[in-house]
Design a protein with these regions (language model features):
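A short hydrophobic beta-strand segment most commonly corresponding to one strand
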Residues: 157-175
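Short, conserved secondary-structure segments in the cores of folded domains
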Residues: 89, 99-101, 109, 131
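A short, N-terminal "cap"/entry segment at the start of jelly-roll beta-barrel domains
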Residues: 11-89, 100, 202-235
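Conserved metal-binding segment of the jelly-roll/cupin
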Residues: 95-96, 134-156, 165-166
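Glycine- and acidic-residue-biased ligand/ion/polar-headgroup-sensing regions
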Residues: 94-97, 104-126
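Short acidic-glycine-tyrosine-enriched beta hairpin
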Residues: 81-85, 125-146
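Classical eukaryotic N-terminal signal peptides for Sec-dependent ER targeting/secretion
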Residues: 1-11
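Structural motif
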Residues: 117-119, 148, 158
Length: 235
């Protein structure tokens, strides 16, 4: 590998670092060759079988409904997507599940509901109102780049949405994880009005990034369990 190739791999690795908790580079060599292909024809020839141009969301290791998942098709998970400037994501929310408050530093996010009913909340900046909308099947909303947003399934059935983002390296930052797990506690405590003991207790209960989704409100989980639905987060 020449200097140019080494540099390109370094840039790829740096660009994907922020989403490494969710997206792993499935084939670094193929990704490098795709991004360096001199022509579109050369690029296409890297994918000799027609099936090589297809991404199967349901075959991905992070695909789950318990509590749910965010499955991304981007240059990390699907090298064929490199160079198109987009990420497509399948959002799965199991009963009473949610995507915790988060933001994408490098992408605007278009989200459309496939089925069910999903409540969404979005805050663009200090001083802006909280925008709350309910997405029923066929309805879409937009989360501008770097806006804080969250989505919640308050029903007892699985809900699915599709997300299109205008970057193949969107980045995702979960607000609670950033505050309570990743920043120095001595900086966070004054900002949230906590004492050291309170802060440590909160940090221990923040869910891991995991598959991108977490179990939501306890009252919803209890309601669905009482109605006879199998809801694992209610234990």
């Amino acid at each position: 590998m020449g200097p140019r190739g080494s540099l390109l791999l370094g840039l790829i690795a740096a660009g994907l670092h922020c989403v490494a908790a969710v997206d792993q580079v499935v084939n670094a060599q193929l990704l490098e060759e795709t991004m360096m292909a001199p022509t579109r024809l050369d690029r296409l020839n890297l994918y000799p079988e027609d099936k090589d141009t297809v991404f199967d969301f349901y075959a991905q290791p992070g695909m789950t409904w318990e509590p749910g998942s965010v499955v991304n098709a981007n240059r990390a998970t699907f090298p064929y997507a490199a160079g198109n400037g987009m990420t497509m994501a399948l959002l799965n929310l199991g009963p009473c599940s949610m995507l915790p408050p988060h933001y994408h530093p490098r992408a605007t996010n278009y989200v459309v509901a496939i089925n069910g009913s999903t409540d969404t909340y979005m805050i663009e900046e200090n001083g802006a109102r909280t925008v709350k909308v309910t997405l029923d099947a066929g309805k879409m909303t937009i989360f501008p780049a770097a806006s804080i947003h969250t989505m919640e399934n308050k029903g007892c059935e699985n809900v699915q949405l599709v997300s299109a983002l205008n970057s193949e390296d969107t980045g995702t930052v979960n607000i609670a994880n950033a505050l309570f797990n990743w920043l120095p506690p001595t900086l966070v405590a004054p900002a949230v009005g906590y004492g050291p003991a309170d802060l440590n207790g909160t940090a221990q209960t923040v869910p891991l990034v995991g598959t991108g989704s977490i179990f939501g409100r306890k009252d919803c989980l209890a309601r669905c369990a009482k109605a006879g639905y199998k809801v694992h987060g209610s234990e």
